[in-house]
Amino acid sequence: MKKLIHFLKPYRVLIVVVLIFTFLQTLGTLYIPTLTANIVNNGVVKGDIDYIVKTGLMMMIVAGITALSAVLVCKVSANLSSGFCRDIREAVFIKSQDLSINDFNNIGTASMITRSTSDITLIGQSVFMFIQLVLPAPIITVSGLFLAYSIDKAMTIIIVVVMFLFMLSAFLVGKKLIKLFKMMQIKMDNMNRVLREVVTGVRVIRAFNRSRFEKKRFDRTAIDYSETAISINKIFAVLMPIVMLIMNLGIVSIIWFGGMRVSNGNMEIGHIMALVEYCILILFYLIMGVMVFMYIPRAGACADRVNQILDIEPE
């Protein structure tokens, strides 16, 4: 993947724009729970209607800026990733024109088609998702923990424990998924190769009455691919309930122990709401970040396959 990074150089300005608006988006996302806590503690509890209205208007402004920043990040990220894919495809096409027959045969027509289409698309999608979901994750996590710590040091431990359990679950599941993603790319190549052979040799197949045999051959490759894809989806299906269980246990713990601290006069009600929001936000962005990182090994395998073409020295 590192060898393809130089294709991002023409988009340095767009990358800076994305970083600026991503920072604004994360700041707004984290500031809203703080305003919610202030409304409850200083407005609802004290019955101060003016404070509620003023803070509510501030929340609307912050929400508007956050939404606008999110839209701009999405739009600029889409332009960046699509331009990145276009440049790689152009480089692969130019390189393919210089390859000898032997070089082309070594790669294979089916594999060349896959690398020029779906592989590059996957690389572009991984760049898009990285910008959208991974970039905000460390900012949200660090800032969220800092804000939670500023509210209550003891309650922050619950969020840290929830994060640890989630990361442990994601690590164990991710090890299995990385292997399956690599297998799936190889099986897609096989399926494309068999399909191309059937399409290009359709006259010969019909002449020798081999249609049934070729159908069975294609079915075997399709079933092989589908079994791997189903295995991946089964693992994702197991991961999400585990994540939701960990998150809900964290929320229940915050409400339970927070309620005890409120009754003892060590915390205000609004702070419980803020801590719950911080926990949800941190876990949400961690979940999205882990999903992308599980996707990246597949994109890395695609990048290696594209680099094989770009690194060939023509005979």
Regions found by a protein language model. Give the residues of each.
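Helix-loop-helix
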Residues: 48, 52, 147-161, 231-305, ...
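A short amphipathic helical element positioned immediately N-terminal to and/or at the very start
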Residues: 1-12, 111-112, 116
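Transmembrane helix-loop junction
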Residues: 38, 42, 149, 175, ...
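Hydrophobic alpha-helical transmembrane segments of ABC transporter permease domains
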Residues: 20, 28, 32, 57, ...
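An intracellular "coupling" helix at the cytosolic face of ABC transporter transmembrane type-1 domains
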Residues: 10-13, 76, 98-102, 118-127, ...
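Juxtamembrane helix-loop junctions of ABC transporter transmembrane domains
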Residues: 20-21, 28-41, 62-109, 113, ...
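Transmembrane helix-loop-helix hairpins at lipid-water interfaces of multipass membrane proteins
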Residues: 9, 15-72, 76, 149-154, ...
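Alpha-helical transmembrane segments of multipass membrane proteins
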Residues: 25, 29, 62, 66-70, ...
